[in-house]
Amino acid sequence: MCGIVGVVGNRNATDILMQGLEKLEYRGYDSAGIFVANANQTNLIKSVGRIADLRAKIGIDVAGSTGIGHTRWATHGQSTEDNAHPHTSQTGRFVLVHNGVIENYLHIKTEFLAGHDFKGQTDTEIAVHLIGKFVEEDKLSVLEAFKKALSIIEGSYAFALMDSQATDTIYVAKNKSPLLIGLGEGYNMVCSDAMAMIRETSEFMEIHDKELVILTKDKVTVTDYDGKELIRDSYTAELDLSDIGKGTYPFYMLKEIDEQPTVMRQLISTYADETGNVQVDPAIITSIQEADRLYILAAGTSYHAGFATKNMLEQLTDTPVELGVASEWGYHMPLLSKKPMFILLSQSGETADSRQVLVKANAMGIPSLTVTNVPGSTLSRESTYTMLIHAGPEIAVASTKAYTAQIAALAFLAKAVGEANGKQEALDFNLVHELSLVAQSIEATLSEKDLVAEKVQALLTTTRNAFYIGRGNDYYVAMEAALKLKEISYIQCEGFAAGELKHGTISLIEEDTPVIALISSSQLVASHTRGNIQEVAARGAHVLTVVEEGLDREGDDIIVNKVHPFLAPIAMVIPTQLIAYYASLQRGLDVDKPRNLAKAVTVE
């Protein structure tokens, strides 16, 4: 949600800002803008729509060595140029970009900014007017004005501020929103995601909450809000530029679906040695052994991945597992067991709802494990332990490979704990071999893309509604499959436990309603789900079946290679990812950038 880029120094700021914003498109946005300055002039350009629309408005004379840019995902005010960032102060002297939500912006407007004229309806404009007031009316220095504003502002924010009268400096501050400093020779940068600046530098510095940074071309000064200077080491971001591009693919989502066999094999090489022995941080294993209950907290696709691993974790670790929606737990944490441990699943490691839960867990002394794709992310820094899923950059808004990688990573964790406990089922579970078979199963499914596209064209091209049904782990996959379809095709789709159809949902079935049935696990499960298929077919539903090999019958639509039941959700979800992809494609939609959605939800 939203993206920030900024640069000061001996570089072409316009090019860097635009390239950086393009790299942040995947986070989701509805408008964009840049502010560029040099010794002789300043330029502020904003646009509603895509980065390409902004680029079309930039003239050849828009040049400078310092600038800030922003992609906006509307939270306060509609998507208009007036509401797009950067925003300016009352006189236009100060320019600000902001990610986050200022909770007390109405109080600030009433208490401090009476008589000010505002162009838009955003909370960010309130903030930059406040800074401008403190300098131009109260005669504070820029730094003192920024600090005073920060002491008043409540909520989440990542700020990058420029003074058009002294354009050799960028002022930065953050609280609860991600922000990084990029380090260069003769230039320095700020960004909300390392991906935005990876072409310019691989050396980054973390900024923690309630810290202020002053950037010039030759120096980075980090302080707390009281002015105490802080020492902060830098780190190298291991991002491959080839992983960020689409290559020959028309969309990132299809590329990322195709990468899943490689991701499975990467996880094997990461979490198992050459002899197949599982290697997981012993401290994580011990912490789980000491817990009497595991609580998986997540949102969206990661929440569904948690469900898909619940049975496996319980069976292999002998520890009860509960699932929680992070956005709900942030407000009301239920009665916990005596020795709880939290597992937070987040592709980005920046999910604001999950962080809200983690802050509470830390305050309560509850050990936590973050399972994420991004090293150095907020959740990974603030949790007790971190386990990386090594899926590589995931650019498409609709998550695919992160979901399957989360399940596979948790399989290694479950087996490691089970082995440490001497659980025979864990000792017998040849995870390296079984996950290799999963990779082969994915490849087999991917070789049937034309078949899936054909089935989708007949089923989903014009419909407004659809349903997924399944039992056991297939129900959990159905929830994820339904989310994927609704995210990128805009088809109203729900995933239901097949056994619940008779308890209400079947009333929604009418002539030609698409119902996609998932069948794996056992003959008993298959028999019961096929009974549900007959029920919906009798009411006119158009049924498509995705069936595990060995449970298939003549007339089934998509057959998936049989894999170990613990890992079946990985194999079974692949056809549903392709179904969502082709449904979106055939409906003429932007697969990678669905409307109203953001890749990383960094505000609560």
Curated annotation (Swiss-Prot):
Domain of life: Bacteria
Subcellular location: Cytoplasm
GO cellular component: cytosol
Catalytic activity, EC: 2.6.1.16
Residues at the catalytic site: 2, 599
Name of a matching Pfam family: GATase_6
GO molecular function per UniProt: carbohydrate derivative binding; glutamine-fructose-6-phosphate transaminase (isomerizing) activity
Domain Glutamine amidotransferase type-2: 2-218
Record's catalysed reaction(s): D-fructose 6-phosphate + L-glutamine = D-glucosamine 6-phosphate + L-glutamate
Stored InterPro entries: GATase_2_dom, GFAT, GFAT_N, GlmS/AgaS_SIS, GlmS/FrlB_SIS, Ntn_hydrolases_N, SIS_dom, SIS_dom_sf
Record bears the keyword Repeat: yes
Span of domain SIS: 284-423, 452-594
Keyword check for Cytoplasm: yes
Cited PROSITE patterns: GATASE_TYPE_2, SIS
Main enzyme class: transferase
GO biological process: carbohydrate metabolic process; fructose 6-phosphate metabolic process; protein N-linked glycosylation; UDP-N-acetylglucosamine metabolic process
The entry's keywords: Aminotransferase, Cytoplasm, Glutamine amidotransferase, Repeat, Transferase
Subunit structure and binding partners: Homodimer.
PANTHER family (UniProt xref): GLUCOSAMINE--FRUCTOSE-6-PHOSPHATE AMINOTRANSFERASE, ISOMERIZING, GLUTAMINE--FRUCTOSE-6-PHOSPHATE TRANSAMINASE (ISOMERIZING)
Function: Catalyzes the first step in hexosamine metabolism, converting fructose-6P into glucosamine-6P using glutamine as a nitrogen source.
Protein name, entry field: Glutamine--fructose-6-phosphate aminotransferase [isomerizing]
Classification lineage: Bacteria, Bacillati, Bacillota, Bacilli, Lactobacillales
